Amino acid sequence: MKLKKFTRRRFILASLFTSLLVATDARYIEPNWVKTRRLRLSNNPSHRFVQFSDLHYKGDRAHAKSVINRINSLSPDFVCFTGDIIEEAKFLPEALEILSGIKTPMYGIPGNHDYWSKAPFDDIFKCFTATGGAFLEDDQRIIAGGKVNLMGVAHLGPNHPLPAPKPEMKNILLIHYPAWAKEFNQKFDLLLAGHSHGGQVRIPFYGPVIVPFLVDEYDLGLFQTKAGPLYVNPGIGWFPYPIRFNCRPEITVIEI
């Protein structure tokens, strides 16, 4: 009987200790513990660039600047941002000031929070253009010496023609919502998305506890879709709660 009581006590203490460790990690460690993931999609890649997503800037200047410094240290050919700079328009000026520190052409698309915040998009366009890139709200650019066709889709519907891949180029499509990959009949060399945050909390051997709308099965990582390979970045920031578990913020270095 004593052994049973002792074992139960140890189990309770171990459970409490484990819960404390998980809570500490999820609240104070992982949200700021940015990792760099490398994704090689070709045996002989000719382009090396960075994707990051879902900054959700809320005034956390030091964290955001450390992300930009990390991106610059990687010396990519160009940078792709897949939506959600902010949640509130009041944070946009400071967020754009920080983003303007990127030292290579930056291309991006809006996310749902960028629209919901009613932020002045003219300022966003100017910021991205100043880096040598562009904000691709249903737009596209031929970049990398005419070798890459970079497209951004912000809306779907009859009033918004879908971009056309170009032959003999690498065709890369930026979308915010991963589930939109199901809507394209064209074939792309790569689709990039954000929005999901990877679920923010991922249970080992199970996956995300919850994901937002328009994610479906494309919650995190590389997927094969009818439109081509889709990579879903887990983002930098968080919403609505400042927690991450088993789902660190990520800067993705892609070779294609």
Q: Which stretches of residues belong to each language-model region?
A:
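Membrane-cytosol interface motif
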Residues: 43-51
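Conserved catalytic scaffold of divalent metal-dependent phosphoesterases
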Residues: 57, 114-190, 196, 213-222, ...
